[in-house]
Regions:
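C-terminal outer-membrane/trafficking sorting elements
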Residues: 389-401, 405-488
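Glycan-recognition patch characteristic of GH18 chitinases/ENGases
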Residues: 17-147
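Short, compositionally biased serine/threonine- and acidic-rich segments at solvent-exposed termini, linkers
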Residues: 381-388
Length: 488
């Protein structure tokens, strides 16, 4: 019975319109900035004694940029800003987001060492099938992406393809698409390539295959309840009887390396009219004749705090999320995430050693600071380095210690600062272990790293025999190797 209920719940929100698609289509009905608009208010470079210890990736939607909420971004607490979005049509053409180019955001991000990612979207299953399977159209799309990256000095691409038409497209065509993209962009391995994936769908999606050809996956761990839901409930339940963020990461993504998972979290909530004051109450459809229209509206975090905290706030122990209720000739409920529930999700990312967390969406918190303070609390470590001239200027790979070793050893290396420009602020780093014949044994580091001194604890596989092994560091054109002795 539990399996049947789980399948029903997963199927329900799998066919629902995602927050990415819904907001994009809704905002198009409103006024937007003309092509070529540039907001002249530039963000200043932030000099702080903070260093992120995990990826903090945020989507910045064009409507939040148009409204000026990008001016509240704290760049020193972000590693990536994903411009949302460049829309792909069925022929491989790209439409820029309104107001493009966002020169103020790009300049401010790069001056603070933040990577700027272009998000390429399509929400039409037939169009996506054509983009993924037609060689000519696919290569045209890749070339348009490449030109955009080069022309605007961007640092990578995030593919957000939703509503794929069938299991074959999810399981096979999407993986082949990413494999071809990785091959197409081999000319510049520093470009990050990533894919936005659903929280559930292991039976239909090949998450491990997508991860193999991506630097990371942005797991959209929200929209568990939404406009389509027949009961109230959390957008992102940390825990739950059948479906939850925790279950998604542990079970649905069990075959994906944890360092390739970004845990997406919501900076928004949902508002319903209901038939009772109880959690998970039956909802009164806003429009009973329209699909995906059961709730009243989406509420950005800033709107929840501004307009609804005057009402009774409660905590749902089932999902570990807050909710609000009030009665005005009928019951109303708002379910959302706050700093308390988000901290629990961040703890999950830390405990599971995930690559980091991701935000839908930047700007949704307005000028409030509590969610930024939470990121600082969970994902930064103090550092005395506040000026570029104090950062290392040379690559170094140090001898491991202890050596010989068993069961583990420490490896240290440095990534330098290069005053020639922002491109050197974060560099692609690999640290691998090989046997004496050159066979790869372990991947210790495979990530983008900011300038600094790094210390890694290496524990070899249990089956590794006694012997001499080589650990090799690669950063751009720089390569260094050293030997170590493992005694079993």
């Amino acid at each position: 019975m539990k399996k049947i209920i789980l399948l029903f719940l997963v199927a329900s929100f799998s066919f629902a319109q995602s927050i990415h698609q819904f907001e994009n289509e809704l905002q198009k009905q409103k006024s937007f900035l003309p092509e070529g608009y540039i907001n002249k208010t530039l963000q200043k470079k932030i000099s702080s004694g903070l260093q992120l210890n995990k990826t903090v990736f945020g989507y910045l939607p064009w409507w939040e940029y148009a409204a000026g909420f990008h001016q509240n971004l704290q760049y020193n607490l972000l590693s990536h800003i994903a411009i949302f979005s460049f829309e792909a049509d069925r022929d491989g053409n790209l439409t820029n987001p309104p107001g493009w180019p966002w020169s103020d955001v790009i300049e401010a991000a790069h001056s603070n060492g933040v990577r700027v990612i272009m998000t390429v979207t399509s929400f039409d299953g037939e169009d996506i099938h054509r983009l993924m399977t037609d060689n000519g159209i696919r290569n045209k799309l890749f070339e348009n992406i490449r030109l955009t990256l080069i022309n605007y000095g961007l640092d990578g691409v995030n593919i957000d393809f939703e509503n794929l038409r069938d299991k074959n497209d999810k399981m096979y065509a999407s993986v082949a698409f990413m494999m071809n993209m990785k091959e197409y962009f081999r000319f510049n391995p520093a470009y990050e390539i990533s894919f936005a994936t659903p929280s559930y769908g292991l039976d239909e999606w090949n998450f491990s295959g997508l991860a193999e050809y991506s630097h990371y996956l942005f797991v959209m761990n929200y929209d568990y309840w939404g406009s389509w839901a027949t009961t109230t409930g959390p957008s992102a339940p940390l825990t739950g009887q059948y479906i939850s963020v925790t279950n998604s990461i542990i079970n649905e993504y069990k075959d994906v390396p944890t360092q390739k998972i970004i845990l997406g979290v919501p900076y928004y909530g949902n508002y319903w009219k209901t038939n009772s004051n109880q959690p998970y109450a039956e909802v009164k459809p806003f429009n009973k004749d329209s699909t995906n229209n059961n709730w009243q509206k989406i509420l950005r975090y800033r709107e929840v705090v501004r307009d609804y905290l005057q009402y009774e706030k409660l905590w749902d122990a089932v999902s570990n999320t807050p909710w609000i209720r009030w009665n005005d000739n009928g019951w109303n409920q708002v379910w959302y995430d706050d700093s308390t529930s988000l901290e629990l999700k961040y703890d999950l990312a830390i405990q599971r050693n995930l690559k980091g967390i991701g935000i839908w969406a930047l700007g949704y918190d307005g000028n409030r600071t509590e969610l930024w303070k939470l990121i600082e609390k969970k994902f930064t470590k103090p550092t005395s380095i506040t000026k570029s001239d104090l950062l290392p200027l040379q690559f170094n790979l140090y001898q491991n210690y202890p050596n010989p070793f068993n069961p583990s050893t420490t490896i240290e290396y440095t990534v330098p600062y290069n005053e020639s420009g922002y491109n050197s602020i974060q560099q692609y780093v690999t640290l691998k272990v090989y046997d004496i014949l050159g066979n790869e044994i372990s991947i210790v580091v495979d990530d983008f790293k900011a300038p600094g001194h790094y210390t890694i604890t290496y524990s070899p596989p249990e089956t590794l025999p006694t012997g001499i092994y080589v650990y090799q560091l690669k950063v751009g054109k720089y390569t260094a190797s050293k030997k170590m002795l493992y005694l079993k």
